[in-house]
């Protein structure tokens, strides 16, 4: 099964997967415009307003928290997961993040044990890293996903991450240290 997302004349199909009672996109969001058609600006530095970030020669997209808070990033009928959505997924898979992970993972710190994952759920979390300091940081070592409380239009202080060093769910701070602006993470949407 797939969903079709059409924005500004561009069409993108995302495969979907059911895990427990939840329906998730099996790929990270790849939008360059909001659902209403407003262009989302490509950025290279954090702290310069809402935007997306894309390392050269890749199909990887990161979005800063400012873009997430603008709304309308998720395809119609879908949303950026809230803390309860992530908690329900965590409980259903018994905190075994390895069954969500796929691709070539590396450890965060030397001496850590590697967990490459089995992707038994078909969630397909790849270790794409995050965006910061004008570049892709920690590729092959982690992936961080946005969490959004749509009711309050707020982002929690920490969001979900998976690392090559752990079979468990992890968390990552959403703000850049000692700054008022947000980091740039991947977006994985869930059906409303």
Question: How does the language model describe each region?
Answer:
Residues 1-192:
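Conserved positions within compact, well-structured domain cores
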């Amino acid at each position: 099964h797939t969903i079709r997302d059409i924005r500004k004349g561009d069409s993108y199909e995302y495969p979907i997967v059911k895990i427990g009672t939840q329906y998730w996109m099996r790929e990270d969001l790849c939008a360059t415009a909001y659902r209403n058609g407003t262009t989302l600006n490509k950025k290279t530095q954090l702290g310069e307003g809402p935007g997306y970030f894309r390392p050269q020669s890749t199909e990887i997209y990161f979005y800063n928290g400012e873009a997430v808070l603008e709304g309308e990033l998720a395809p119609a009928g879908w949303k950026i997961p809230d803390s309860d959505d992530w908690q329900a997924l965590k409980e259903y898979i018994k905190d075994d993040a390895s069954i969500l992970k796929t691709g070539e993972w590396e450890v965060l710190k030397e001496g850590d044990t590697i967990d490459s994952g089995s992707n038994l759920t078909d969630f397909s979390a790849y270790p794409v890293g995050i965006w910061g300091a004008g570049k892709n940081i920690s590729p092959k070592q982690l992936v961080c996903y946005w969490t959004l409380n749509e009711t309050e239009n707020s982002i929690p202080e920490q969001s979900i991450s998976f690392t090559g060093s752990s079979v468990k769910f992890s968390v990552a701070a959403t703000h850049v240290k000692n700054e008022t602006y947000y980091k740039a993470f991947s977006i994985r949407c869930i059906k409303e």
